[in-house]
From Swiss-Prot:
Physiological role: Specifically methylates the guanine in position 1207 of 16S rRNA in the 30S particle.
EC top class, as a word: transferase
SUPFAM superfamilies: S-adenosyl-L-methionine-dependent methyltransferases
Record-level Gene Ontology MF annotations: 16S rRNA (guanine(1207)-N(2))-methyltransferase activity
Gene: rsmC
EC assignment: 2.1.1.172
Pfam families: MTS (PF05175), MTS_N (PF08468)
Protein name: Ribosomal RNA small subunit methyltransferase C
Similarity section: Belongs to the methyltransferase superfamily. RsmC family.
Oligomer status and interactors: Monomer.
Catalysed reactions, as listed in the record: guanosine(1207) in 16S rRNA + S-adenosyl-L-methionine = N(2)-methylguanosine(1207) in 16S rRNA + S-adenosyl-L-homocysteine + H(+)
Amino acid sequence: MDPRSEVLLRQAELFQGSLLLVGLPADDLLGKLPDARGWCWHAGDQAALDARFEGRVDFGVEAPEAAFEAAVLFLPKARDLTDYLLNALASRLAGRELFLVGEKRGGIEAAAKQLSPFGRARKLDSARHCQLWQVTVENAPQAVTLESLARPYQIDLQDGPLTVVSLPGVFSHGRLDRGSALLLENIDKLPSGNLLDFGCGTGVLGAAVKRRYPHNDVIMLDVDAFATASSRLTLAANGLQAQVLTGDGIDAAPMGLNTILSNPPFHVGVHTDYMATENLLRKARQHLKSGGELRLVANNFLRYQPLIEEHVGQCEVRAQGSGFKIYSAKRS
């Protein structure tokens, strides 16, 4: 069981009744708290939880409509996402209890200060390298909309400026990361047809490709509902249309692709996790048509080239700079 869940269960008497577990891990916590419900935005966690606790977990970027008497937020990595979620919960919990749990290395001590606008926060427990904090919501805020927290910015591309709309919790919120910048300089001569932007994030790559190659069918896929919501806003801001999917890795992608384009993630919360990218490299061949291309950007220190050559085909480095490389391989 996740150590954060273990800390909650040390105080199980506090968590009886109508409780909302927000950003919960895919463990057995719901089994231990039979009256609780979950809310998550990670498609993999949602699938795992729904398989075991069908109908008890809501998915998406908005708090579920069903009433709850208390809520526990599992601290996310991004401070601005924490602010959004705490506001959404506290606005529904006037006079009731809001809890925050997280790992010490994830910044729970500092994050606990984000409870102070709602009342006097106190630490209830510290164990398993985690902390549990609680506040009685004395100052319930007005709920803010997610879109009001968006950070739009423009990037200059070969065919003109592109507007990117970034939401809290999305990778490189409010700015273009160096890996994507390098990949955007190298989206020439892509195969025509169906293109997948894998790990789409803000949607900057998929939107740029759709505008440059308007006759291509672009599919944008991410495991995170905040990312796919951001991608939809980016498309709308540029008057573009594409299919946007929230799903758990390459297994959620369609078959028969001509191109897979990606700046793949390698972090889950505060943890490094290469599994999604390695799974992409192992299975990309199954999703690509013969002659289809995998083109991705990765940090120099990540040794993806041997894996690409083993599972996709001969791999070349198309470009490199700023600590990143662009890899390209065509399915034979």
